[in-house]
Amino acid sequence: MKNYPILIWKLSKALLMRIDLPDPVGFAEVFRKTIRIPFDTEVTGITTDSREVQSGDLYVAIAGERVDGHTFLKEVNDQGANCALVNTVSKESTITQIKVDNPVTAIGKVARAWRDQFHIPVIAITGSNGKTSTKELVKHVLSAQYNVHATEGNYNTSIGLPLTLLQLSQVHTASILEMGANQLGDIAELCDIANPTHGIITNIAPAHLEGFGSIETIAETKGALFKKLNNGVSFVNAADHRVNALEVTGERISFGLTPECDFPADLHHEDDGTIT
């Protein structure tokens, strides 16, 4: 029972998501090859929220603990959705229904296939705190040289990250993805979808302990990012002893406040109170 609030919280975030697809024709081809079923329906957007459906959308029906998205198939059809991704076909709706074992898993597989078309740096950022601010800082720096694709809002979950990836287009030359976690295995799952080339773990702290149970489980969950970067680069915050102790399988680049780091910070407190 103690995990129910976490599941409900995660579901409430997922049900508020919608994107426009940059390449509907390309999406249809990738979807057809990945799901391996006939698919000739034009889809211009994807949503998990029945209230946000727009004409031409693919509606992803998610069955949660308290709300089952399958109960809204008639409504999304009336609002102009072209089709729905479901795990149970409803005879009460005339909308085109694509049956899969798990709609969230299916859209994750499609997103991975979509991501694999792009041979660009994909930087994953996770941590107990500071994910969004770090993402924005990295985005700001890289924008001087790259056309950056990045996570927006709370799109850092098992449904939000796939939707973020499906907004990648040929104009992008780098991607920055925020990854959130609330239980063991979440980051490994997101890495399997995103296939990152670089990774940053901001810190490891006792956040969302109700889902993890211990700080050690948090470290294991976040540390999956570095383990997944066999041929990539892990940026290690050496100032955090838990992050510094994580196993790195690829290239390791450390940063922090000590001279032993590969990139030590040189901070100075000025007389006016500013830090340079």
List the model feature ranges, each with a label.
Residues 84-91, 238-242, 257-258:
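Short, polar loop motifs at secondary-structure junctions
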